[in-house]
């Protein structure tokens, strides 16, 4: 069976970590996990045999990995360009030192373009919150490791991009 060893809660209530122990003889199927008033179906897959190097493909020379700085790629949702309460309110496409307004929706809107280029994987600059007074366009001034920056769309847009890309 399955044994719950530890529950870890985070500042962002959208996340919860469960440390579980799955016995070697546990069969594949659906485990019901109760979280508060909600029950979540957790799929238990058939265990793979051997070490990871026997079945992990990773990136190969046949892959085309495309690095995207979301702020610079495409502005798919102008409503998130400036977020009240955030310190960096700059928005000026005429200088490299300010935010340009690109976001996750802009990337999602151009998945066909990336596909047509032959892209097999998208590598994003950091997308977590960068609430610093300036130079936050690159994503490396993160101030919260558990929240997606709302100026590029937040958690909802991040999930939508991932779902659309797969």
Give, region by region, the residue ranges found by the protein language model.
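Immunoglobulin-like IPT/TIG beta-sandwich domains and homologous Ig-like subdomains
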Residues: 1-37
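N-terminal structural segment of carbohydrate-active enzymes
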Residues: 36, 40-166
């Amino acid at each position: 069976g399955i044994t719950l060893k530890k529950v870890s809660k985070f500042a962002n209530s959208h996340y919860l970590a469960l440390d579980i122990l799955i016995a070697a003889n546990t069969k594949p199927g659906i485990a019901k996990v109760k979280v508060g008033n909600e029950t979540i179906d957790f799929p238990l897959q058939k265990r793979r045999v051997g070490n990871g190097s026997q079945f992990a493909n990773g990136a190969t020379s046949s892959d085309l990995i495309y690095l995207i700085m979301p702020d610079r790629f495409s502005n798919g949702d102008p409503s998130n360009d400036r977020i009240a309460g955030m310190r960096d309110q700059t928005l000026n496409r005429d200088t490299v030192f300010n935010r340009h307004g690109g976001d996750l929706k802009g990337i999602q809107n151009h998945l066909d373009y990336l596909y047509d280029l032959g892209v097999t994987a998208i590598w994003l600059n950091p997308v977590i919150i960068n609430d610093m007074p300036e130079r936050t366009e690159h994503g490396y001034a993160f101030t919260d490791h558990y929240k997606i920056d709302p100026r590029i769309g937040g958690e909802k847009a991040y999930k939508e991009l991932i779902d659309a890309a797969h």
